[in-house]
Amino acid sequence: ARQGFPVRVFEQSPEFREVGAGIQLGPNIFRVLDKIGLKEAVLDDAHRPPAQEMRDAVTGKLITRVPLDDAFFKRFGQPYAVTHRADLHATILNACLGNDLIKLETNQRVDGFEDSGDGVVATLGNGSRVNGRALIGCDGMWSTIRESIVGDGKPRVSGHIAYRAVLKRSDVPDDLWRPDVVLWAGPRTHFVHYPLRRGELYNLVAVFHSDHYEEGWNAEGSTELLWQHFKGQRPEVLRMLERIETWRMWVL
């Protein structure tokens, strides 16, 4: 659309929305956001952590610390930040809504496509066909478009499961609050936490190996299973985990 081409976006859900949790944004993505004019809008909602840390989840020992300061910016030319997926999604959505060349269409699933020689014909779930110069498959991990082109089958489960949750700043004890992105590395586990939305929220991600899962990215996780994998770890880790009553499970 920035080059003058009309664009139609087909979304199979009833509305455009994002219900995930935190996401880390490195210099590469900020280079793209800068190019399309959204960098500052994204940074307005984001948190700029002073550093990334990795600690041993059993001993508490600091393994490494990577400052994300002026030297980092000078080296890579762009910042590092963390933000809520819903905030990032809203910024991009609002930019699309403000462009007359972009038409957003909900309740529309792309089931397939054909190469017409000088363009492409997409078949929608309601049976209608749409002509265009090009088709960009942005339909995620379970992509129909990718499967049609590459033929690589269904995604393979890695054995890693991520449990996600978000806390309000007021629900995090002061002695557990850290402005950094912190990763606690344990036996076949890791636990990550960092602030979101200018420090108003706190993002938690607990990852472990398990054969017990449901396909998808938003099922409810088992607290009992989580504790089986994280028992014996540092009090800081366990105290943070116990503050969450409901986890959302994300199979990797």
Feature-to-residue mapping (PLM):
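FAD/FMN-dependent oxidoreductases across multiple families
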Residues: 175-176, 187-189, 197-200, 208-252
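Short beta-strand micro-motifs enriched in acidic
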Residues: 115-116, 194-196
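A structural signal for isolated positions on well-ordered beta-strands in alpha/beta enzyme cores
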Residues: 8, 103, 192, 203-205
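Flavin-dependent oxidoreductases
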Residues: 161-194
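Conserved N-terminal helical subregion
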Residues: 26-168, 211-227
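Glycine-rich FAD pyrophosphate-binding loop
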Residues: 1-21
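Short phosphate-binding/catalytic loops that engage adenosine nucleotides
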Residues: 5, 38, 235
